[in-house]
Amino acid sequence: MKAENIQLGIAPIGWTNDDLPELGAENTFEQCVSEMALAGYTGCEVGNKYPRDVAVLKHKLDVRGIQICNAWFSTFFVDGKREETIQEFIKHRDFLHAMGAKVIGCSEQSRSIQGTTKAVFKEKPIFNDEDWQRLAEGYNELAKLAAEKGMKVSLHHHMGTGIQTPEEVDRYMSVVNDDVYLLFDSGHLYYSEGCQKAMLAVLEKYIHRIVHVHLKDVRDEVVAEVKAKDLSFLEGVKKGTFTVPGDGVIDFKPIFDILEKYDYKGWMVVEAEQDPALANPFEYALKGRKYIREVAGV
């Protein structure tokens, strides 16, 4: 890949998990961002231990050579919470803009089971036509609000939500306007479909509307257990569903090849939530960085 096209970041979820705060509760913000920099990353997303004061956060990141590239935002358009979502989005947008980010990664969390004990494969929400209409209207509005600050809105397809499968990604992309984008996540698509082919098909199909990339690997044996025992998304996380690139079943070279073929310019972010007591965050950050350097050449 062309180094000038790619910026490489890592998410703090490997140090402290926002959905399971007890995972990594002992890890401090300063430790997290210092280890990111030591491992060779120049950007990150935002975790629950990050200072929310822009000046304070900027200083702590600047001295480490780290910048914010995105932060998760939950939308609830399908549930009818349009105005509340928009008001919260404006605050989120303004924070990210002040931090220099260009992309806002959103997830439609209406009826999501990702934070519950429900079986992630059998009990995920299914949206009807009215749901999709509400979602499209909401995301089209977010795109306009993001554009006011020169930013782009992207949707993060995610296990346990109404936009998980390739078919649901297709529906999302067909109902929203062209100025609404996609956050591609290798791990969530592989997890959902259980194969590399389906994941790569989504990447290539929508490459021109992908504005942010999450790199996460998957442990097949854990996914098999999640399916066999009807486990929840978070139970899978604790058992080790996800890991850094190069440590699981996904072959990332075809991903990098597609991104290079279509001249993708932007961030690739290692986002691999694990139990830090079992997978030392710094060591795994180094492992992922080494693999990306060797396979992608960046």
Swiss-Prot record:
Keyword Lyase annotated: yes
Catalytic activity from the UniProt record: scyllo-inosose = 3D-3,5/4-trihydroxycyclohexane-1,2-dione + H2O
Gene Ontology terms for molecular function: manganese ion binding; myo-inosose-2 dehydratase activity
Cofactor(s), by name: glutathione; Co(2+); Mn(2+)
InterPro entries the record matches: IolE, IolE/MocC, IolE/XylAMocC-like, Xyl_isomerase-like_sf, Xyl_isomerase-like_TIM-brl
UniProt xrefs under Pfam families: AP_endonuc_2
Biological process, per Gene Ontology: inositol catabolic process
Keywords of this entry: Cobalt, Lyase, Manganese
HAMAP family per UniProt: IolE
Name this polypeptide is given: Inosose dehydratase
Organism: Glaesserella parasuis serovar 5 (strain SH0165) (Haemophilus parasuis)
Taxonomic lineage of the native organism: Bacteria, Pseudomonadati, Pseudomonadota, Gammaproteobacteria, Pasteurellales
